[in-house]
């Protein structure tokens, strides 16, 4: 569930989300290691936190590429409060870091954070910043400060063990009106700095309690929505992916007796029979003039 709204005469906007089930679904879909679960989980939470601020029918993609062993993590959200994502190396594992936590920064390494905003126009808007920590939350705050000139704070966490995802969530606070009194800015900064890790917070406190600790007072009107893991892949799209292959690759699949397309976003497998591949080959030949 995501909670979102504004504070201080609409000069500050916030969102806070708990989405254990969504991150657990991602873990199961992609058969992720513990560390990969935390990395993808953090990215999905980051993408979920911006959903209240997206334009109608907007698709927002967080794409992080780094020098670390996970190589790449991608999370996408929509204005319909859906998310999906994947990592390049779902089996990555590293020793715990010096704080005894999963080494997300080590898994990602040095690299870039790219945001793609697709509003359904001809060309999506793409912005890119260097990673400042590889922990994802700090990198998102840096992105918003530099690329969108919005002072922001993000806190994101995932707790996972042999039983699966235990806690997953985070919050985002953004100053959207620079006329906000300096004392309010300092209050928010101080309160956020004094908070424990978000995974510790969510073991004891509800989202509205966390917001009260951030702002120093009860929040007023809060809207809510359910965050869902949803992919828009289907068999027709998988078939079109096969048609992009050259004729020899399709013929090799046909000789093997089947072809398989796996969606990178949700790991759904689409299997095509020898007869279906024969039809695709015929279609490709008929429409290529060869």
From Swiss-Prot:
Subcellular location: Cytoplasm
Post-translational modification: Under oxidizing conditions two disulfide bonds are formed involving the reactive cysteines. Under reducing conditions zinc is bound to the reactive cysteines and the protein is inactive.
One GO cellular component term noted in the UniProt record for this chain: cytoplasm
Molecular function per GO: protein folding chaperone; unfolded protein binding
Domain of life: Bacteria
UniProt cross-references to HAMAP family, sorted A to Z: HslO
Job description of the protein: Redox regulated molecular chaperone. Protects both thermally unfolding and oxidatively damaged proteins from irreversible aggregation. Plays an important role in the bacterial defense system toward oxidative stress.
Family of the protein in this entry: Belongs to the HSP33 family.
Listed name of the protein: 33 kDa chaperonin
Species assigned in the record: Thermotoga sp. (strain RQ2)
Name of the gene this protein is made from: hslO
